[in-house]
Amino acid sequence: MALLQIAEPGLSPQPHQRRLAVGIDLGTTNSLVAAVRSGLSEPLADAEGQVILPSAVRYHADRVEVGQSAKIAASQDPFNTVLSVKRLMGRGLTDVKQLGEQLPYRFVGGESHMPFIDTVQGPKSPVEVSADILKVLRERAESTLGGELVGAVITVPAYFDDSQRQATKDAARLAGLNVLRLLNEPTAAAVAYGLDQKAEGVVAIYDLGGGTFDISILRLTGGVFEVLATGGDTALGGDDFDHAIANWIVTDAALSADIDPSAQRSLLQAACSAKEALTDAESVEVAYGDWRGTLTREALNALIEPMVARSLKACRRAVRDTGIELEEVEAVVMVGGSTRVPRVREAVAELFGRQPLTQIDPDQVVAIGAAIQADTLAGNKRDGGELLLLDVIPLSLGLETMGGLMEKVIPRNTTIPVARGQEFTTYKDGQTAMKIHVLQGERELISDCRSLARFELRGIPPMVAGAAKIRVTFQVDADGLLSVSAREMGSGIESSIQVKPSYGLTDDEVTRMLKDSFEYAGDDKVARVLREHQVDAERLLEAVQGALEADGERLLDEEERLVINLQMDELRELMQGTDGYAIEQQTKRLSQVTDAFAARRLDSTVKAALAGRNLNEIEE
C-alpha cells in the first residue's frame, strides 16, 4: 500500500508549526469558510464580524462585488448580478435553458457547450463566478490566519455528478486554492458532530436551506461513511415558508395580489423577520405599510405544515430505499438555517423517534466539519499524535461481471479510508446465489487482473432475471484492510469477506501492472466492447427463449414465432465471431422484432396483477 506523506520532502513543518488549511461550504445561497484554531473548528468572520457570505456576485465594468452588497443589488442590476450559481455548475447550455424563467440571465454559448452569463465584463462561466466567491473566502482565511493556505476541503452535495465535482475543483484552482478533497456535505455535517468517531451506525442528515431540501442516509462502519441514499426537493426551502407568510399577510390585510417587485421584496422581508422571531417567541407583531397584525407560532405551523410534510415524505422514501427501518437511524443531524423553525425540529423528532442534533449552528455545521477534515489532511498533529499520513489505493479494486470483465468500484489513487457501493442484479431467472469475485488491477479483462478473493451470496429470493437488487460495498479502512459485502436489498441477506489488497505486491509489480494497462489500453477496450456485446446478446437470447417457452404459443402466431427464431439463429451465429458491431446490430434487430411480444406479455402480467384490486390499494 503506497503511503503519500502530506508534507513535501524538504518542506516538512517544524515540530510545533501548523499548516494552514480550511474547510469551505460553497453553498447555493450562502458560503462559509472555517478552520481549526486552538483545537477547535470555527467559522472565520470578515472585517465586519460576519461569518456568512451570501453567494452573490455582481460584475461592474472595472471590479467584482461579492456578498451582501451584491445580493441587495440583484433587483436593480439583474443581468450583472449572479445568484445561486451552484445550480449551474457542471451543466450544459441546454440544461440551464430548461430552467426557464428561474434564471433571469442572458446566456451565451461557447465551443464547449458550457453556459456563459453575459455581463458588463463579458461572458462569465459558472466556474468563473464560483471562483470569485472562493477567492473572497480564501483572502478572508489568509488574512485571519496570517499566512498562505496549503489547501482546502470543499463540500459538495452528495448527489453531485462527476462534471459538477470537476467544475467545483476548476473553480477552486482558478481562485488559487489547492483542493485537498471534495467532501460530501452530509458527511461533513456528521464529522462536525464527531459521529465519525463512533464504531458504526446509521445517520440521517436533514438539510433544509433557503431554496432546497436534501435528505441523506449514511452508514458508518470502521470510521468510513457510505452514502446509502439521497433524496429531497429542489423546490422546497425556507423561501417557501416566507412566501406562505407573505400570502397570509396579503389575505389578512386585504391587499391586491398584483404587487410590484419592490413591494414584493418588502413583503417577503417582513415575512422572513416574522418567521425568525417565532423561533423563540410564541407570537409576533407583523407590520407592513399601514397594516398591523399578529402571527402566532401555531398559525405559522399551520401555514408551513404542507411543506414540512413534503420533506418528511422525502425522508421516508430515502430510508425505504436503503432497505432499513426508521428505528435503525441512530442520529439525525440538522443542517441549514430553515431547521431553526421549531415545527421542523418537532416533525423530524416525531418521524425518527429521537431528538435531532442541533447544538452546532445549522448554517455553520458543514463548514465546521470540512475544516476538521482539512486540518487532518494538511498533516497537522493531533494532541499527542504523530504526523498524519494519507494512504492511497495503488491499484483499482473491483469485481468480475458477466463476460469475464473487470468492473472497477474504487479507482486507483483514491485516498483512504473510503467506502463505495454499486448495485448489481441477477443474470438468470430464478437465480438464488451469486458468486462475488474481488479483483485488483487496471485492465479490462479479469484474466489480466489480480484475483484477491471469492465468496458467495446465497439465499437470494427466486425472481425473474434483473429483478433482484444486490448492493456490493467495498470498504477500505485506514489500515488498508479491504472488506467486501454483498446484500440483497429485498430480503436483507448478506455475506462478506476481508482481504489485505496490497499483500504480496511489490512496488515493481504495481508499476508493471500500471505500465501494462497503458500499453494494452487500446486492445483492452476492443476486447471489452466485444465481451459486452456478447453478454448483451446472450442475455437477450435467454430472455427471448424463456418468453417463447412460457407465452409463445399463447401470444404469438406461427409467422411471428418463425421471424423471431430466424433472428435468434442469426445472432447465435454472429456470437461465434469477433465482429462486435455486427453482434450489436443483430441484438438490436432481435430486440425490435420482439418489442410487440414483450408489450403483450407486460399487458397480460399487469392485468393479472391488478385483477380484483382498486386504486387505493396500489397507491403508496
Swiss-Prot record:
This is Chaperone protein HscA homolog. One of its GO terms (molecular function) is ATP hydrolysis activity. GO terms for biological process: iron-sulfur cluster assembly. Chaperone involved in the maturation of iron-sulfur cluster-containing proteins. Has a low intrinsic ATPase activity which is markedly stimulated by HscB. Pfam families: HSP70 (PF00012). SUPFAM superfamilies: Actin-like ATPase domain, Heat shock protein 70kD (HSP70), C-terminal subdomain, Heat shock protein 70kD (HSP70), peptide-binding domain. The keyword Nucleotide-binding applies. Keywords: ATP-binding, Chaperone, Nucleotide-binding. Belongs to the heat shock protein 70 family. Transmembrane segments: none annotated. The gene is hscA. Coiled coil: none annotated. HAMAP family: HscA.
